[in-house]
Amino acid sequence: LKDEGEGENTMNRFIIADPKKCIGCRTCEVACVLAHNGGKLDTLTKANFAPRLKVVKGLNVSTAIMCRHCEDAPCANVCPNGAIVRAADSIQVLQEKCIGCKTCVVACPYGAMSVVTKQVEVMFNGLSQGFCLKAEAQKCDLCEGQAAGPACISVCPTQALHMIGRDTMQAMLRKKQMRAALDEANEMSF
């Protein structure tokens, strides 16, 4: 996995959904699409709607599924063009290198990758030569480059989405260890 200038001992950040809080409203999907398309409302049409996360609804539960920014990311490991890299404590797609081969979609264990087709302008010597279709891999990029951070987190009406980083993960681990220690201590008899 190519590392774009990150330290070796850092953990990738990721967003996780709490299915106990998710109501399946899809507000996160809408916020994602708007955040990645400059707030243009025409991207909310059925033909153009391509969120980088997906709300999955079951009979009794709903939750958002998105990229977990794996440390040893299967999508990056199989990319034949080196278009998926580790950068800014996350896994990012370099669209200029992506050839839309869908290998990453097959490799992702979470179903968090998709390939979308976009119309792009073809330029030659600074002049437009028209438009063509380009397929490109898409996944959660943690709204990288947006000062407000991930749009999905800030709009969730039930606060079901949370950013997990190294500190949060360590705090969760300590809490679980303490709970396990107390549970075991309560059941001991000598």
Language-model features, listed with the residues they occupy:
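Conserved active-site region of classical short-chain dehydrogenase/reductase
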Residues: 23-26, 102
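N-terminal "mature ectodomain cap" immediately after the signal peptide
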Residues: 15-20, 27
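Ordered, amphipathic secondary-structure segments that act as subunit-interaction surfaces
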Residues: 70-83, 87-92
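Flanking helices and flexible, charged tails adjoining ferredoxin-like Fe-S electron-transfer domains
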Residues: 6-8, 12, 40-45, 50-77, ...
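Core segments of cupin and vicinal oxygen chelate
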Residues: 27-43
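Hydrophobic face of beta-strands forming the core of extended beta-sheets/solenoids
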Residues: 17, 93-94
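Protein kinase-like catalytic domain
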Residues: 33-36, 80, 109
